[in-house]
Amino acid sequence: MKLIIATRKSQLALWQSEHVAQILKNTHQIEVLLEGFKTKGDVLLDSPLAKIGGKGLFTKELEESMLRKEAHLAVHSLKDVPSFFPQGLVLAAVSKREQSNDAMLSQNYKDFLSLPKGAKIGTTSLRRKMQLLLLRPDLEIISLRGNVNSRIEKLKNNDFDAIILAMAGIKRLNLDKQVNFVYEFSKDELIPAASQGALGIESINDEKILELLKCLNDENALIETSIEREFIATLEGGCQVPIGINAELLGDEICVRAVLGLPDGSEILKDKRMIKKNDFKGFGESLAKEFIAKGAKELLKKAESMI
């Protein structure tokens, strides 16, 4: 049997797809091919992600290729995957999670506190912008799009004093070797995006395919990301609004951190909870409902109007 993986063509997307392909080859001794596609999010590089808006910016074209029967599965950064799937497609697996925190890359400054007043920080994310301004209101946060290499290049050209990337991508592509300093944010400083660091394997809803993909599943990643995705789905929040949610398994307990608010950090809702591992089902939804009772929906509408 031959499996075809639909993938974006970015360096990180190809790494992720090749990583999954290798596991499938080793486990089942089957042929696995990669088919590259450009998504809307890859093409529209002039506008900040929040202004392009809409869900599925980095997934829609891959999903369409599966529905046309050109591919059997697609490998996504799970944080880019909307909560609901087109008919005929399913979330087949969530693979073992890489580090889920954010990091600051810089040529001249070894950590966040050493940044000078008014330092220029590059990031695409309103979630990061909001939390960075909570920590350092003096910073100038500038939208930064493009692939990882172009972002590193802009940093080296001194367009920015620092840029913010996910630790998962930094580790997968060995980006720490390309810059002088990498400062890892704690999850209390910067709460990550839902599912950050996890890979989501989406596939056609076919029993034979789903059976082959079972080997990719990681129970801990599934538990953590189900809380996070439930929280986002209940709030009906996409990647264009500033929401951070992270569930971290610590033995038989789970530490859940959540934040949402306005992009400038002037108004936020934030919480941190410890729950028993066995109580994870439904917790993301119940936490989101608590946030909604405190005015989360109104705050997110206000955030959208500021974009």
UniProtKB/Swiss-Prot annotation:
Q: What is its quaternary makeup?
A: Monomer.
SUPFAM superfamilies registered for this protein in UniProt: Periplasmic binding protein-like II, Porphobilinogen deaminase (hydroxymethylbilane synthase), C-terminal domain
Which residues does the record list as S-(dipyrrolylmethanemethyl)cysteine (modified residue)? 239
Q: Which GO terms describe its cellular component?
A: cytoplasm
Q: Which gene encodes it?
A: hemC
Question: Could you share any additional remarks the record makes about this protein?
Answer: The porphobilinogen subunits are added to the dipyrromethane group.
Q: What is this protein called?
A: Porphobilinogen deaminase
Catalytic activity, as annotated: 4 porphobilinogen + H2O = hydroxymethylbilane + 4 NH4(+)
> Looking at its record, which EC class is this enzyme?
transferase
